[in-house]
Amino acid sequence: MHPYFSLAGRIALVTGGSRGIGQMIAQGLLEAGARVFICARDAEACADTATRLSAYGDCQAIPADLSSEAGARRLAQALGELSARLDILVNNAGTSWGAALESYPVSGWEKVMQLNVTSVFSCIQQLLPLLRRSASAENPARVINIGSVAGISAMGEQAYAYGPSKAALHQLSRMLAKELVGEHINVNVIAPGRFPSRMTRHIANDPQALEADSASIPMGRWGRPEEMAALAISLAGTAGAYMTGNVIPIDGGFHL
């Protein structure tokens, strides 16, 4: 592997790493040489995924429910017992909620905002000591937040809280990038369009819906796991050392 993309000796944590985009990124980081911890609320699924991903490198599971500040604190404590530092934090855990406008529940809105925005803030806050231990001017620590093209473009689909939550995450990331750059901690956002995941499987499993959805994307298709992994590796590697405060769409041109 070219040294520009090697993550040998680096320690990474991927939240929501048991499936979907989180699993894609975790596998990519492992293949690039990083030691990777994944966390998810479902302890069994998290452990099963870590076992599968161990075929690519050193992967360990940390069960964690990030729906509260206490959960983020427990995650940081658990990671601190396993590693003295954290080089790469990927905040991927998230959720959505869909319902008609007239019946959209406030409880659903609050759940989406809590997990997609507040929990990311709490995770960064609680993991700052470990990130600071790895940060240097030559090789900054990296925070990679997983936003969405829905935070850039008005996608609708009755997911009224999802787009606003991702737009809020994008802005939070810019603010943190500005604040933490002096401590050699870089904060960037990956804003995916369509990728295979639990959140999009209802479309993927319907051939007509998949065809119509793909037609709305300028490149005419969904993203592939290796494309998501490659972008994360770039941000975690040499290219990401001189980047902070960016929101990077990976959506086949959907945001244009």
Swiss-Prot record:
Binding site for substrate: 148
Catalytic activity: a (3R)-hydroxyacyl-[ACP] + NADP(+) = a 3-oxoacyl-[ACP] + NADPH + H(+)
Keyword NADP set for record: yes
Pathway recorded for this protein: Lipid metabolism; rhamnolipid biosynthesis
CDD domains: RhlG_SDR_c
Pfam families: adh_short_C2 (PF13561)
Disulfide pattern: none
GO cellular component: cytosol
Active site residues of this protein: 162
MF terms in GO: 3-oxoacyl-[acyl-carrier-protein] reductase (NADPH) activity; cholate 7-alpha-dehydrogenase (NAD+) activity
Enzyme Commission number, as recorded: 1.1.1.100
Annotated NADP(+) binding sites: 14-38
Keywords: NADP, Oxidoreductase
Function, in words: Required for the synthesis of the beta-hydroxy acid moiety of rhamnolipids.
Family (UniProt): Belongs to the short-chain dehydrogenases/reductases (SDR) family.
UniProt-recorded name of the protein: Rhamnolipids biosynthesis 3-oxoacyl-[acyl-carrier-protein] reductase
UniProt source species: Pseudomonas aeruginosa (strain ATCC 15692 / DSM 22644 / CIP 104116 / JCM 14847 / LMG 12228 / 1C / PRS 101 / PAO1)
